[in-house]
Every structure is written in C-alpha cells, then in structure tokens.
UniProtKB/Swiss-Prot annotation:
It comes from Glaesserella parasuis serovar 5 (strain SH0165). Keywords: Ribonucleoprotein, Ribosomal protein. One of its GO terms (cellular component) is cytosolic small ribosomal subunit. GO terms for molecular function: RNA binding; structural constituent of ribosome. Gene3D superfamilies: 3.30.230.10. It comes from the Bacteria. One of its GO terms (biological process) is translation. HAMAP family: Ribosomal_uS9_B. The gene is rpsI. InterPro entries: Ribosomal_Su5_D2-typ_SF, Ribosomal_uS9, Ribosomal_uS9_bac/plastid, Ribosomal_uS9_CS, Ribsml_uS5_D2-typ_fold_subgr. Belongs to the universal ribosomal protein uS9 family. This is Small ribosomal subunit protein uS9.
Length: 131
C-alpha cells in the first residue's frame, strides 16, 4: 500500500487499539485480512464500525484497511470507529464538526474498575448479616 493518497488514524477503546488506513475506492472494509462481515459476527459491532462513514456519507467512496488487536468484540468495534473518525478528519478537516457532534472524536476513557480486597468484585460486597 502506498502512502501517496491514503490517510491514517489510530483508535483506542478499553484494551483494544486499531490502525485505520483510508484511501479512495468503492467501500471495501478489510479488518485483519478479513471482510467486515466475516470478522464481526454481531450486527451491532458492524453498525458501530460503519457509523462515522454513514454520518459523512462516504460509505461507497472510500476503501478501509484496518488492523486491530487486543480486547473483545465491543472494544475492537469502538477502537475501529475511533480510528476511522481520526482518519476521516485527516482526510477532510471540514468533517470534524459533524463527527464531534455525533460524539465520535472523543476517546471513550472508561476502563474496567479494579477488584478491591475484601469485596467479591470491584463494588460487589459480601452479603451483610445483621445477626
């Protein structure tokens, strides 16, 4: 892949990170050498990935080459969405306000809360016995 007419964006969510390359094309989305439909079985994950492209109406005009690692399905889909958004902003800065209004530009900083000593989970306490 040549660097001449392509744009790049890095996306992160939870423990996933995605590298997204966009270039003019006809709407092919390749994730880790597999198509979007093969990589994500869940329709919700596919929908999350397509959101920024549908918002700016460039679904059929750009080809996406994506590598993603770490985390699960939801985290990877969110990381890809963040990466696509950053790549689109690099491609055309005038898209930023629309993407910002939709909330795609901001990195979702939520992480898994650590388990505390004396508790079952992060906040789940042992059952309280009055007597």
């Amino acid at each position: 892949m040549t660097a001449a007419n392509q744009n790049y964006g890095t996306g992160r969510r939870k423990s996933s990170s995605a590298r997204v390359f966009i270039k003019p094309g006809n709407g092919n989305i390749t994730i880790n050498q597999r198509s979007l439909e093969v990589y994500f079985g869940r329709e919700t994950a596919r929908m999350i990935v397509r959101q920024p492209l549908e918002l700016v109406e460039l679904t059929d005009k750009l080809d996406l080459y994506i590598t993603v690692k770490g985390g699960g399905i939801s985290g990877q889909a969110g990381a890809i969405r963040h990466g696509i958004t950053r790549a689109l902003i690099e491609y055309d800065e005038t898209l930023r306000p629309a993407l910002r209004a939709a909330g795609f530009v901001t990195r979702d900083a939520r992480r898994v809360e650590r388990k505390k000593v004396g508790l079952h989970k992060a906040r789940r306490r042992p059952q309280y016995s009055k007597r």
